[in-house]
Amino acid sequence: MGIPISISIVLILLFGSFLGWINGYVTVKTGVHSFIVTLATMSIYFGFMTLLTEAEAFRKLPETFTDFGSMKLFNKYISPLLLLSIFTCFVLFYLFKFTDIGRKLIAAGANPDAAELSGISVNRMFIYCHMLSGFLAAVAGIMLTSRIGAAIPSMAGHLGFDWLLPAFLAPVIGGTLLSGGKVTVFGTMLGAVLVTLINNGLYLIDVGEFWVRFFLGLILLFAVLLDRAREYFTSKNSIVS
């Protein structure tokens, strides 16, 4: 379409935030669990994308964009995508730790009733969380497209389902509570690194797709049980104190 790459990136980030807003708005208005809404809209969005693109890959991307994803820095050891990921972590850490809206997001997740009593609009914070999630998903999509060197609609659906389990596993391993109220940004990144190492290691020893899924699912189950136990003891200690 001849749109400059910088403007295209901004539009993609805004569109990702908008899709996240839809998820949050539907969840707030219907009361359906956000997990169900997100799974449903993932399939809907993929269907619309396939319809609009006719499942054809876009390979004629600007060289500056594709080179960014393939280049290596510091004697060809470090990808700029890794540096971008670390930068994103620092931005999120600052958001949750030092900004008013970040603290409100945490408070709304930790105790919605108490947050409402203190004047925080929990529904609004809930929608903001989904918008942030959509924004970060757009960032990940841009990074992946830059690394591959093409936008391939047919691949997006497979990646969405393939990354669904690791996307849940990384934050839980990193220390984020699934029930909300506690976010560990750097822990989540380390969890993502650990999940990637486990995933790649299983593929390297050629255990087969079934066993890769089996072990990742087993780790997720253990992590969720650990999350529940941590949540239980945290609430118990708060009651005692």
Each predicted region: which residue ranges?
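Hydrophobic core segments of alpha-helical transmembrane domains in multi-pass membrane transport
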Residues: 13-16, 42-47, 84-94, 130-141, ...
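Membrane-helix interface residues
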Residues: 3, 30-32, 99, 120, ...
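Transmembrane alpha-helical segments in multi-pass inner-membrane proteins
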Residues: 137, 151-216
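Hydrophobic alpha-helical transmembrane segments
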Residues: 6-14, 36, 82-87, 127-131, ...
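Cytosolic-side transmembrane-helix boundaries in multi-pass membrane proteins
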Residues: 113-124, 198-241
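Membrane-interface helix caps of multi-pass small-molecule transporters
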Residues: 18-29, 51-52, 94, 98, ...
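Helix-loop-helix "hairpin" substructures at the membrane interface of multi-pass membrane proteins
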Residues: 4-12, 18-23, 74-152
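Transmembrane helix-bundle core of multi-pass membrane transporters
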Residues: 30, 34-99, 125-128, 148-160, ...
